[in-house]
């Protein structure tokens, strides 16, 4: 049986921008994407800790080391600058092939979206 598991997560990142009139997506600092094993244009789930909104979009690479977390397009209606969000990617795997000790790549960030630990 194929199951869907959390592949990577950026935990409690702070939204730095919201650009309503931009191509719909989520721009994320490439350093954070790399640490969480996320790829450009990969589908992500975003959970807004402040207002409870949950939505899906795809990733656009942001400048390395910038701390950028930008809600673009319609997603800008679901959050605002300063909101905390959780960004999650998923993968599918045969259940029998998933090791019992499997752990997703999780990146915890500070208030400036700098990694605390991964």
UniProtKB/Swiss-Prot annotation:
Keywords: Autocatalytic cleavage, Cytoplasm, Decarboxylase, Lyase, Pantothenate biosynthesis, Pyruvate, Schiff base, Zymogen. InterPro entries: Asp_de-COase-like_dom_sf, Asp_decarbox. Pfam families: Asp_decarbox. The modification Pyruvic acid (Ser) is found at residue 25. Its EC number is 4.1.1.11. Substrate binds at residues 57, 73-75. It comes from the Bacteria. It catalyses: L-aspartate + H(+) = beta-alanine + CO2. The keyword Cytoplasm applies. Its cofactor is pyruvate. The keyword Cytoplasm applies. Its main location: cytoplasm. The active site is at 25 (schiff-base intermediate with substrate), 58 (proton donor). It is found in: Cytoplasm. Pathway: Cofactor biosynthesis; (R)-pantothenate biosynthesis; beta-alanine from L-aspartate: step 1/1. Binds 1 pyruvoyl group covalently per subunit. GO terms for biological process: alanine biosynthetic process; pantothenate biosynthetic process. Catalyzes the pyruvoyl-dependent decarboxylation of aspartate to produce beta-alanine. Belongs to the PanD family. This is Aspartate 1-decarboxylase. It comes from Leptospira biflexa serovar Patoc (strain Patoc 1 / ATCC 23582 / Paris). The lineage of its organism: Bacteria, Pseudomonadati, Spirochaetota, Spirochaetia, Leptospirales.
